[in-house]
């Protein structure tokens, strides 16, 4: 297994050209820029540069006042064109364009993850997903039908958005009405009974008003998986008043409904590193892998969710250089599911005979019935001005936010065991029934922030920002008394069995100060070097609204604990080459995370744990020629425990679910006016798995390559077709693995998607 921890030499050669290009971009970029220089006697011809559809030049968030090329952070912007060309219908698929980012973790033991369970630079980032700069709560899959672009910011984002994951954030930008009329529609069919349709209508009404309607419907089975299905529908109407004037009002609504059959994964038997959990089950060592099509759930398994979001944004241009914006949003995400997973320890195996085909494993029912709500009002002011010879790009604002979550208690669901090699899903345990043992969390936040980029000279910039958050979190939780197993409590005298009894009722208030500072120097008009330092904090209850009583226990949500703190240093360079159509970036980074909860020798818990993630990242986005577009990147990252208990299965100090090497590249070429071809590849390196005492489960997942391709054909100005092929070489790989290592999600096999796009 030792070899799995390193980047395979035979695969490294595939990256040689790309890595060499980006690691040495400074001299290369200078040479490219020099090609455009002229002598004093030459005739100078100025041509307008057409922006690349693969490299948006500006973040849509007004908190980022500088272009992406002059932002002292590692930032990847995935444009709508990239999403369309790749046929990426959800956020997780779109994020495959960012190296080292993905849904690699399948959950805790019998508790499976759902939705966009994203890991980035060694940390769970699923609680740091935003829509238009506003937190989006819920463990659901987010469709891209109403998305203009996806912005991925690596490193602490506490200064930008408040409490957040220590290693990055993801911001989905919604489509808005625009000052032109047109219709775009698409219809898709593909493998595994994939059917999808979208409609995007924008209509101008008068000189300054426009309406826009986006609609989506999709039904599909999961390729390579029996019984797993997904069905979702969405509608997003919006209207804009005052387009092209100094006063603009935008009204938006989003509704998405999903009815899915969740996937609890399959046993890891037969994977590299697996061994039977006991001598009595040694036959599993040579019984072979299970069929990856196997479904270990029941016919009653489901995952239903409903998202409703209403937004009002008003913008006023005070003058040509100053704009004030006010945004009010209400959003609710309701989700309930019954998901069955398997538990594969020695005590969970039943052996009727010596034939492994008769053996069974225990099933466990994962349940959730939750409602998340957010109400926020945010005011932002942006302005550009001079104080003497120093230029300023200022973004400042205030935010008022209330977030609430109710987890409805449900009665336990008991499930029979399942055959390891021949599972039967024809079981109907019924739906969920609430028992009143609810958990309620609420966080109120008032925040004020200010950012400024100072143009000291033509070539030298300084930037800084600070954000102050005052927060108050309340949490109460009840348990149905008289139960059994972990967390069970005895019923008080006179209280009937199954009655809800309050076990936690507590609150936490505090202030957070997050800040960032950076400097940038332009080596040439097209290239720069920069440094940046940022601090971000996550208070107890900050990621799930749950608090734990002070004084005992290992929960990071204890009210007597301090916020988790992350400090990130970054030094990098960015170059716009080929007439500024292509952006090349490279950066070295280090993130130190402190105040992790660790156990003391006497059995109590304290906050002395420290983690570190460090490495480098290189990226490319834009046009090599007017007909050739690319987006991609490579990262090497080392994530370790610096102080505290090792959490990897192999006993090393490595952080789990973090590939040491990751690469992604997508390229599209317009061969003729009517024919386009595209191809891409991505590599996810070997990852450590977490440890929880499970015996015999794999300590690593193996690295893998996946290739995709696309062929496009334009019939006329109103109609074109595109054929996407995913996992072109039908690679067998582990997409995610759970903490115990009993189960994993196999990667999708080779699939096809044919789409007709209509434009009017």
From Swiss-Prot:
Topology with respect to the bilayer: Multi-pass membrane protein
Protein name (record): Catecholate siderophore receptor Fiu
UniProt record similarity statement: Belongs to the TonB-dependent receptor family.
Function: Involved in the active transport across the outer membrane of iron complexed with catecholate siderophores such as dihydroxybenzoylserine and dihydroxybenzoate. It derives its energy for transport by interacting with the trans-periplasmic membrane protein TonB. Can also transport catechol-substituted cephalosporins. Receptor for microcins M, H47 and E492.
Residue pairs linked by disulfide bridges in the UniProt entry: none
Gene Ontology molecular function: siderophore uptake transmembrane transporter activity; signaling receptor activity
Subcellular location: Cell outer membrane
Induction / repression: Repressed by iron.
Signal peptide: 1-31
Transmembrane segments: none
Organism: Escherichia coli (strain K12)
Domain TBDR plug: 67-175
PANTHER family: CATECHOLATE SIDEROPHORE RECEPTOR FIU, FERRICHROME IRON RECEPTOR-RELATED
Highest rank taxon of the organism: Bacteria
One Gene Ontology term from the biological process aspect of the record: intracellular iron ion homeostasis
Domain TBDR beta-barrel as annotated: residue spans: 180-760
Originating gene: fiu
GO-annotated cellular components: cell outer membrane; membrane; transmembrane transporter complex
Residue window of motif TonB C-terminal box: 743-760
CDD domains assigned: ligand_gated_channel (cd01347)
Keywords: Cell outer membrane, Ion transport, Iron, Iron transport, Membrane, Receptor, Signal, TonB box, Transmembrane, Transmembrane beta strand, Transport
Listed Pfam families: Plug (PF07715), TonB_dep_Rec_b-barrel (PF00593)
UniProt cross-references to InterPro entries, sorted A to Z: Plug_dom, Plug_dom_sf, TonB-dep_rcpt-like, TonB-dep_rcpt_b-brl, TonB_box_CS, TonB_rcpt_b-brl_sf, TonB_sidphr_rcpt
């Amino acid at each position: 297994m030792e070899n799995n921890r390193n980047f395979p030499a035979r695969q490294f050669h595939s990256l040689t050209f790309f890595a060499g290009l980006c690691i040495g971009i400074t001299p290369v970029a200078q040479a490219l820029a020099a090609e455009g220089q002229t002598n004093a006697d030459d005739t100078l011809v100025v041509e307008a540069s057409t922006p690349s559809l693969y490299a948006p030049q500006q973040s849509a968030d007004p908190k980022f006042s500088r272009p992406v090329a002059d932002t002292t952070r590692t930032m990847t912007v995935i444009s709508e064109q990239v999403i369309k060309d790749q046929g990426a219908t959800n956020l997780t698929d779109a994020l495959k364009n960012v190296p080292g980012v993905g849904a690699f973790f399948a959950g805790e033991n019998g508790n499976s993850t759902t939705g966009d369970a994203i890991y980035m630079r060694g940390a769970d980032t699923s609680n740091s997903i935003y829509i238009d700069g506003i937190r989006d709560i819920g463990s659901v899959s987010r469709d891209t039908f109403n998305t203009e672009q996806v912005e991925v910011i690596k490193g602490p984002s506490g200064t930008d958005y408040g409490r957040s994951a220590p290693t990055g954030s993801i911001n989905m930008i919604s489509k808005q009405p625009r000052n032109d009329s047109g219709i775009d529609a698409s219809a898709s069919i593909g493998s595994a009974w994939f059917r999808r349709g979208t409609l995007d209508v924008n209509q101008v009404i008068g000189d300054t008003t426009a309406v826009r309607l986006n609609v989506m419907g999709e039904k599909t089975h999961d390729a390579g998986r029996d019984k797993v299905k997904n069905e979702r529908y969405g509608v997003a109407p919006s209207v804009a008043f005052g387009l092209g004037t100094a006063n603009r009002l935008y009204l938006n609504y989003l509704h998405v409904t999903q009815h899915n059959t969740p996937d609890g994964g399959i046993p890891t038997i037969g994977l590299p590193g697996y061994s039977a959990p006991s001598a009595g089950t040694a036959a599993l060592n040579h019984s072979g892998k299970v069929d990856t099509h196997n479904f270990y759930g029941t016919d009653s398994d489901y995952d239903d969710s409903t998202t409703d979001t209403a937004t009002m944004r008003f913008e006023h241009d005070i003058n040509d250089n100053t704009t004030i914006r006010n945004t009010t949003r209400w959003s609710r995400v309701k989700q309930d599911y019954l998901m069955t997973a398997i538990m594969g320890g020695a005590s969970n195996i039943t052996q009727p005979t010596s034939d492994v085909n008769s053996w069974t494993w225990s099933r466990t029912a994962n349940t959730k019935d939750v409602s998340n709500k957010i109400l926020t009002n945010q005011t932002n002011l942006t302005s550009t001005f001079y104080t003497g010879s120093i230029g300023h790009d200022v973004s400042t604002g205030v935010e008022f936010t209330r977030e609430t979550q109710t987890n409805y208690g449900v009665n336990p669901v008991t499930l029979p065991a399942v055959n390891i090699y021949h599972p039967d899903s024809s079981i109907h345990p019924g739906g969920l029934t609430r028992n009143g043992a609810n958990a309620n969390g609420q966080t109120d936040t008032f925040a004020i922030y200010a950012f400024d980029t100072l143009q000291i000279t033509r070539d030298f910039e300084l930037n800084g920002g600070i954000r102050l958050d005052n927060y108050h979190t309340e949490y109460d939780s009840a348990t149905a008394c008289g139960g059994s197993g972990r967390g069970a409590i005895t019923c008080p005298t006179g209280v009937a069995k199954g009655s809800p009894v309050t076990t936690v009722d507590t609150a936490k208030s505090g202030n957070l100060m997050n800040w960032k500072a950076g400097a940038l120097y332009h080596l040439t008009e097209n290239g720069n070097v920069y440094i940046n330092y940022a601090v971000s904090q996550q208070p107890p209850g900050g990621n799930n609204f749950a608090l734990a009583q002070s004084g005992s226990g290992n929960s990071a949500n204890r009210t007597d604990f301090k916020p988790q703190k992350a400090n990130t240093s970054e030094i990098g360079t960015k170059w716009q080459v080929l007439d500024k159509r292509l952006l090349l970036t490279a950066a070295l980074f280090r993130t130190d995370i402190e105040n992790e909860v660790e156990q003391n020798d006497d059995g109590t818990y304290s906050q002395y744990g420290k983690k570190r993630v460090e490495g480098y990242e290189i990226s490319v986005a834009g046009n090599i020629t007017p007909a050739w577009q690319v987006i991609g990147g490579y990262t090497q990252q080392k994530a370790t425990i610096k102080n505290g208990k090792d959490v990897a299965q192999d006993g090393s100090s490595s952080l789990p679910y973090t590939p040491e090497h990751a690469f992604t590249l997508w390229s599209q070429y317009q061969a003729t006016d009517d024919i386009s071809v595209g191809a891409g590849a991505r590599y996810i390196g070997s990852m450590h798995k977490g440890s929880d005492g499970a015996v015999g489960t794999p300590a690593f997942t193996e690295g893998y390559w996946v290739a995709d391709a696309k062929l496009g054909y334009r019939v006329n100005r109103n109609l074109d077709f595109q054929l996407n092929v995913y996992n072109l070489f039908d690679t067998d790989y582990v997409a995610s693995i759970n903490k115990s290592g009993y189960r994993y999600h196999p990667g999708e096999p080779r699939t096809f998607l044919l789409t007709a796009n209509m434009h009017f």
